[in-house]
């Protein structure tokens, strides 16, 4: 899998974006063909699909965790299906405690703490496992643009800071599909980020299904130390902002590609940077689960989702069919 940082021209158009724009037509046409010629499979449970219309971190994982914890409070049997990013997975697998991130992906390992998880790179492979587990609800993390299965409820996550970038499709921009299509079809839209500033103009027409959410720290971390932050996630800027809002003194940071698998050399270099700055290393849970033996010298920032309108979410999730 190719791992990329979020290029600057994805946020603000420049000559590179315009050069790549014709290739975006090909991407759009291939997506159109998939939807035209595929008949969706109806899974034997209610399907809640959480996705986004752009590349990069938009808070999907935290939304899935929130949903999982919500369903637990209602004693509803559920299964989480994840995309196994960054893994060498060949077949759909029920995630076990002994699985590594290389085997099933970082998100799968994290979400397995919140419920039963099926990791897969091919949504068509999950059907036998779904029949085996017999859940009442299936939470699908990502696969929003995948036409191979029917979705009962769709939730689109939007990052407040990046929104829809430069408005171009991949590779000229960050979009997997144009927002008007995704948002119009969605049952709920999560706007993830600092709630100040109101609703962006681009989302105003979707206010009746909009939930504003913030990702807040849930860890108890010593604020009297210096920290050197690093991450290999889709939206590292939001991680660094969360650290700042938590009141930590960040003396430096390093960004790695999304879903990056750390080498021993990386960890040694990070340790040297931290030592030089008289600081302690700090990272995200997604990065922390991939570090292995070095995790005892690194602080992990855990986060949770806080939403402004839980009643709207409950109404959509628990409405009678």
Curated annotation (Swiss-Prot):
Enzyme Commission numbers on file: 2.7.1.130
Molecular-function annotations in GO: ATP binding; tetraacyldisaccharide 4'-kinase activity
Annotated residues for binding of ATP: 54-61
Known catalytic reactions: a lipid A disaccharide + ATP = a lipid IVA + ADP + H(+)
Keywords: ATP-binding, Kinase, Lipid A biosynthesis, Lipid biosynthesis, Lipid metabolism, Nucleotide-binding, Transferase
Any GO BP annotation: lipopolysaccharide core region biosynthetic process
One Pfam family recorded for the sequence: LpxK
Pathway(s) it belongs to: Glycolipid biosynthesis; lipid IV(A) biosynthesis; lipid IV(A) from (3R)-3-hydroxytetradecanoyl-[acyl-carrier-protein] and UDP-N-acetyl-alpha-D-glucosamine: step 6/6
GO cellular component: plasma membrane
SUPFAM superfamilies given in the database record: P-loop containing nucleoside triphosphate hydrolases
NCBIfam families, per the entry: lpxK
Family statement drawn from the similarity comment of this UniProt entry: Belongs to the LpxK family.
Name the UniProt record assigns to this protein: Tetraacyldisaccharide 4'-kinase
